[in-house]
Each structure stands twice: as structure tokens, then as C-alpha cells.
């Protein structure tokens, strides 16, 4: 470096140091409040700026928390949120004790049973390592995280450790009218090889009716998301897995979601499948519909396998990368299912959407055939969905602005 810029820099530094000496320093009390504010802002800026730094959050600034009485600093904030969310009760969860609870299950346990009004649980950034149950009495519960890359609930059971696939969940919902925003559900069990026994590992199992997930993440490998029964809505979610990673007998609409395969690549053909839908008879009103989604990742994967004889899966206006195998669909080794399944694609695009080599029981749907799958009427959402999207008029940025008053 030439000498002149070095001298200029030194002079500038010296003048700053001199200036600091001549300014009267504030009291230590206001300094600590400035530090706390900066701490909160720094934490918040990582939420909207560099999302991938979320794993640092819970190491910073917790030494400031003892300056606050948590209830005192959030009175105004909770009343504003209560008004905004139309909830009767707001509970907060924070790993460092700056909320009402330090784990999610404890907060869920105090939710009033069979409540007709909503309870909001706000979960601060961090990885909450616990196996969580929302039992059927905890109706009308809303859980709000700080972004799906910042707030996660994680466990690592498998079918082997839990005794069966369904009980390997990290988070299960049995209650009706459950809503989650901006939070992740993870199963951290190792990714199995295709065909490995008892390695299924569920991140989220949903059995409650009328559930909605906005901006949530679901992370696992085999059997990530057990969409078991009931009507469900997934909006702008991130769903990761390898084998049958969206499965079950739910009736669900997936809108604007990212489906990310982590299936292993190999030379012997198929290494994974997105869906395994469980509809068993004509009478069952179940099925999975994907609209405006994006499929990407690794491996050679199927759009779906016919788990149930009447399995129903439709992809509309969805981008499919080259990881989708040319045949697209699989009969689960039973050719009789080919007559009864509904496997459809409608106006999909991308290298994986080429249907020239699709199996005959995978259909390209007309507009009229697709129409019953592509909007919220598929899940009777016009009746119940508006009650879940209680912050539709606010972006997550606005919610974040409110949260900063507390954290």
C-alpha cells in the first residue's frame, strides 16, 4: 500500500480518537441501554438480511437480558399484537429466559383447552431441541417463529427408535384449527439409503383439521411431512426430504412452496419420491394438490408413488428441475392401482416436466380437469382459511417490526 493513504488513514483515526475524548461520555446506564438496543437491532437485521447467519443469534447479547423485566418491556407490544392477531392470549418462548417460557411444549401445555378464541405463542430465534405434542384439546393455537431459517423445533427419532413411523415425529398436531408462521420443524436423524429398514423419520405429523402453515420449513429425509388427515394449507413453505417425503391421507393444498430433494444420485435409476398419498377408496375425500411450486435438489426422483389404491396427487403450474425421472410416477409394485389412482400434471414447466416418457397412468390434465384442484375450494378453504390467515394484511416485515419492541 502506498504511504500516503496509510498516513491519511492514521490521521483520520487519530482525529476520531481525539473527538471521542472531547465529547462528554454518557452515563453507564444509557450506554448499556444503547448496547441493548444495538444488540436487538443487530439480531433483527440478521433476520431480514443475512438469513444464513441465524446460528449465531442465541450466542449474542443474552448478558443484557437481566436489564429488563420481560413483562414490563412487552406490555405495550403484546397489546398491539393481541389486537393485530385477534387473539385472547399471547405467550412468548425464548431459549434465554426472556419470554414466558424457555421451551415450546411448556407454552403449549398452558394453552386453554378447547378454547374458541385464538392463543398466540411467539417463539424467538433459536433451535429448540424437544419432541412436541399439540394434543386435541389445544384448539385455535397460532405459533409464530422469527423466520423458518431462524426458529426451529428439532428432534431425531426414527421408526426404529419410536417403534413406528408415525411416532417418530419431532412435532405432532392433533388439534383442529392450528396455524404456524415462519418456523421450522426438523428431524435430524441421518439420511437413510433407499430401502434401509426402519429409518423413516418424521419432522411434522399433522392430524388436526383446518390447519395452515405460512412461511414454514420442514426438514428431514425419508417421510419428512406426515400429512396424515384433515384439510390443510401450506403457503410459501420449504419442504426437504428424499423418499416419500410428503405422505399420508390428508386433503391439502400446497401453494408457492419450494420442494427440495436431498435424494442421493446413483446410476441404477430412481432414488427418491416426493409424494406417497394414502387415499384408499373412492369415498375418501383426500389428496395433495401443488400449485405454483418449485421442485429442485438432487437425486433421480418420482413425483409420486401409489401408496393408496386411489392415491390422488396433482401438480399445477409447477417448475420441475431435471431431477424428476422421465416416467414421473410409480404404481408401488401393484399394476391394479393404475386404474384407480389420480396422478395429474397441469401446465408444469422446466426440464423435469417433459411428459413424453411419462407412465400412462400419469395424466396431463385439461383446464377443466385441473380446476377443482387449483384453488382453496379443494380444501373447502373459502369456509375456514380466512380465519387462519390472521395477519394477511401485514407482511412478515411488519410483524418483525412489532416483535422488535419485545426482544
UniProtKB/Swiss-Prot annotation:
Q: Which domain of life is it from?
A: Eukaryota
User: In which tissues does this protein get expressed?
Assistant: Expressed in siliques.
Site feature: Transition state stabilizer: 222
Name this protein carries in UniProt: Probable pectinesterase 15
Positions the record marks as coiled coil are none
EC numbers listed for it are 3.1.1.11
- Listed binding positions for substrate are 165, 200, 305
Q: Does the keyword DNA damage apply?
A: no
Q: What keywords were assigned to this record?
A: Aspartyl esterase, Cell wall, Cell wall biogenesis/degradation, Glycoprotein, Hydrolase, Secreted, Signal
Q: Where is the signal peptide?
A: 1-22
Enzyme active site: 223 (proton donor), 244 (nucleophile)
Q: Which residues are glycosylated?
A: 100, 137, 150, 156, 177, 182, 266
* Pfam families in alphabetical order: Pectinesterase
Any one GO CC term of the record: extracellular region
Q: Which pathway is it part of?
A: Glycan metabolism; pectin degradation; 2-dehydro-3-deoxy-D-gluconate from pectin: step 1/5
- What family is this? Belongs to the pectinesterase family.
Cited SUPFAM superfamilies: Pectin lyase-like
> According to its UniProt entry, what is the function of this protein?
Acts in the modification of cell walls via demethylesterification of cell wall pectin.
- GO molecular function terms attached to this record: pectinesterase activity
Give the enzyme class. Answer: hydrolase
Main localization of the protein?
Answer: secreted
Where does the protein end up? Answer: Secreted, Cell wall
User: Per the UniProt entry, what is one GO biological process?
Assistant: pectin catabolic process
Amino acid at each position: 500500500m502506498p504511504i500516503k493513504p496509510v498516513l491519511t488513514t492514521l490521521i483520520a483515526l487519530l482525529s476520531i480518537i481525539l473527538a471521542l475524548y472531547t465529547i462528554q461520555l454518557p452515563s453507564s446506564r444509557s450506554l448499556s441501554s444503547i448496547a441493548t438496543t444495538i444488540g436487538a437491532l443487530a439480531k433483527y437485521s440478521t433476520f431480514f438480511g443475512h438469513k444464513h447467519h441465524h446460528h449465531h443469534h442465541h450466542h449474542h447479547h443474552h448478558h443484557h437480558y437481566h436489564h429488563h423485566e420481560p413483562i414490563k418491556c412487552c406490555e405495550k407490544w403484546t397489546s398491539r399484537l393481541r389486537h393485530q392477531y385477534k387473539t385472547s392470549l399471547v405467550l412468548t418462548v425464548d431459549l434465554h429466559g426472556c419470554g414466558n417460557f424457555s421451551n415450546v411444549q411448556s407454552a403449549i401445555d398452558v394453552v386453554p383447552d378447547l378454547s374458541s378464541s385464538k392463543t398466540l405463542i411467539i417463539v424467538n430465534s433459536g433451535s429448540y431441541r424437544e419432541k412436541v405434542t399439540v394434543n386435541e384439546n389445544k384448539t385455535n393455537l397460532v405459533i409464530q417463529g422469527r423466520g423458518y431459517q431462524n426458529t426451529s423445533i428439532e428432534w431425531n427419532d426414527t421408526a426404529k427408535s419410536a417403534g413406528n413411523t408415525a411416532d417418530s415425529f419431532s412435532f405432532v398436531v392433533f388439534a383442529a384449527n392450528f396455524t404456524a408462521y415462519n418456523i421450522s420443524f426438523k428431524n435430524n436423524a441421518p439420511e437413510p439409503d433407499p430401502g434401509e429398514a426402519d429409518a423413516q423419520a418424521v419432522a411434522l405429523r399433522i392430524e388436526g383439521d383446518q390447519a395452515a402453515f405460512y412461511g414454514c420449513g420442514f426438514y428431514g429425509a425419508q417421510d419428512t411431512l406426515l400429512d396424515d388427515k384433515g384439510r390443510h394449507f401450506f403457503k410459501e413453505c420449504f419442504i426437504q426430504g428424499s423418499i416419500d417425503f410428503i405422505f399420508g391421507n390428508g386433503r391439502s393444498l400446497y401453494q408457492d412452496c419450494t420442494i427440495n430433494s436431498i435424494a442421493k444420485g446413483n446410476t441404477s435409476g430412481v432414488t427418491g419420491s416426493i409424494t406417497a398419498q394414502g387415499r384408499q377408496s373412492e369415498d375418501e375425500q383426500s389428496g395433495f394438490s401443488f400449485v405454483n411450486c418449485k421442485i429442485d435438489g438432487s437425486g433421480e426422483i418420482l413425483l409420486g408413488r401409489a401408496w393408496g389404491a386411489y392415491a390422488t396427487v396433482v401438480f399445477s403450474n409447477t417448475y420441475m428441475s431435471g431431477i424428476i425421472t422421465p416416467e414421473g410416477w410409480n404404481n408401488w409394485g401393484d399394476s391394479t392401482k393404475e386404474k384407480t389412482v389420480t396422478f395429474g400434471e397441469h401446465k408444469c414447466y422446466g426440464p423435469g416436466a417433459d411428459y413424453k416418457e411419462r407412465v400412462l397412468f400419469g395424466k396431463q390434465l385439461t383446464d377443466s380437469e385441473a380446476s377443482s384442484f387449483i384453488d382453496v375450494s379443494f380444501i373447502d378453504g373459502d369456509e375456514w382459511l380466512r380465519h387462519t390467515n390472521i395477519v394477511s394484511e401485514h407482511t412478515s416485515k411488519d410483524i418483525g417490526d412489532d416483535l422488535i419492541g419485545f426482544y
